[in-house]
C-alpha cells in the first residue's frame, strides 16, 4: 500500500474510532451550547472551534463572557465585515483567513497557523460555516506546529465535528492530509 493510501486508511480509521468514542476520548474537548454559535466545541483553555455565528447579538457577548480574545473566521463571505465590526466593538480581535471549498487554495493556512499559534491571541475561537474547516485547520496546526500524529489530531478533529455529516467533510479531510504531507517537518 502506498503512503497516500496508508494515510487515507488511517484517517478513515480515526473517523470510525471517533464515532465510537470511549469515555477517555471524551476528555479531548467539550461541546457546549453558546447562544448564537453553531456547533461550539471547547478544545482546551486556549482554543474553541465551531460553525457559523448565527446571531452576532447573542454570540459576541457570549464569546466575550467566555474570555475569547480573538475570533478567527475561516469562511469569510458577505457577512464578515459586519461580524468584524461587532467583534471589534466588543474589544476582541477579528481575523479572516477564508478557505474556499471550491478552489481549495492552501494559501490561507500559513497565516492561520501563525495566528493560531500566537499566545497573544489566546483564547481563540476559530469558526467556519458548519465547523468542518475550523476542525480541519486546527488538525493541521496540531500536526504541523504541535508535532501531533495525524491519527491523534484526526481523532480530535472528528470529535470537533470533522465527520462525514455533509458532502464537504471528505474534501476537508483530504485537504488536511495533503497540506500536512507537504508541510510536515
Segment roles from a protein language model:
Residues 3, 21-22:
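Intrinsic disorder/low-complexity segments
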Residues 1-11:
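Bacterial N-terminal signal peptides that target proteins for export
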Residues 132-137:
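Glycine-rich nucleophile elbow surrounding the catalytic serine of serine-hydrolase chemistry
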Residues 22-124, 139-185:
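Cys-dependent protein tyrosine phosphatase-like superfamily
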Residues 126-130:
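Histidine-centered catalytic micro-motifs
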Residues 10-20:
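Bacterial N-terminal signal peptides
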